[in-house]
Amino acid sequence: MTDIGAPVTVQVAVDPPYPVVIGTGLLDELEDLLADRHKVAVVHQPGLAETAEEIRKRLAGKGVDAHRIEIPDAEAGKDLPVVGFIWEVLGRIGIGRKDALVSLGGGAATDVAGFAAATWLRGVSIVHLPTTLLGMVDAAVGGKTGINTDAGKNLVGAFHQPLAVLVDLATLQTLPRDEMICGMAEVVKAGFIADPVILDLIEADPQAALDPAGDVLPELIRRAITVKAEVVAADEKESELREILNYGHTLGHAIERRERYRWRHGAAVSVGLVFAAELARLAGRLDDATAQRHRTILSSLGLPVSYDPDALPQLLEIMAGDKKTRAGVLRFVVLDGLAKPGRMVGPDPGLLVTAYAGVCAP
């Protein structure tokens, strides 16, 4: 198990490479990373104002001209007006190309602050400090940034790798339980596409997997981050292999949009994982036991595994505009076995209907 008293570093081997440091009390690391910057802007969500101010003061103590930029929580903060606000503040305080941003918050804060960093002066440095499980294992690692528009989720964005990612496990101590549960969907995804030990650890004790004070969760986080780091290193710009990280996301993103983002990302992805497993099972590509294992593990963590039985026509319409769709043809990441991800391109409409009915069955 990962020793939460000793920081662990996972390297993301892109060019240039950067570290993902997992531990507790990592603000000293942040000071060291940014001590040579003239100005720094800390982009944070409302509930983290106190931590953001501590960061500002610590950087100021190192001679850095640091500022705070507060943005709305969750998906409400991932739109063009919020990015425009960040740009306006960056211009007002004079952030230059050799300065830096810090993102502090969940996955949405990482996405929008990362996009602002990618586009301001055509790219300035950013350090991510994710404070949610979802942000730690998914949004903060890999360099994907983006915002939502009326056309869809994350359709506007850029690849912009951070200077570093600091995963401070202490922030999980105060994370609401429903946030912890939803973040586990991305951990489970990593288990199915690449690291079955993740699934074994969860099955052994689902409640221990959700305990921020225990030693199981840090190990799950390390393993999930390692999966993503290895995939990103092999395919930074999502030309092919990185697409496997979208397992469960085609339907998941459609559910989020249909629900106007009232459903949490992890909850929607959980249903998407079950749907993708059912697609593969019906197509003869995945055995019954592994497909059922999706439901069992996700349910044991308190994640949803079914959705509105009447929603498929609307979901299909939304999925047709998904960024993973090419030339109007739906694409799904599916499994050809445990830790054997593949793709299903243009599935038969009848197969989609039958698979969705299976998801909606009690």
From Swiss-Prot:
Pathway: Metabolic intermediate biosynthesis; chorismate biosynthesis; chorismate from D-erythrose 4-phosphate and phosphoenolpyruvate: step 2/7. It holds the Pfam family DHQS_C. Its cofactor is NAD(+); Co(2+); Zn(2+). GO terms for cellular component: cytosol; peptidoglycan-based cell wall; plasma membrane. One of its GO terms (biological process) is amino acid biosynthetic process. It comes from the Bacteria. Was identified as a high-confidence drug target. This is 3-dehydroquinate synthase. It comes from Mycobacterium tuberculosis (strain ATCC 25618 / H37Rv).
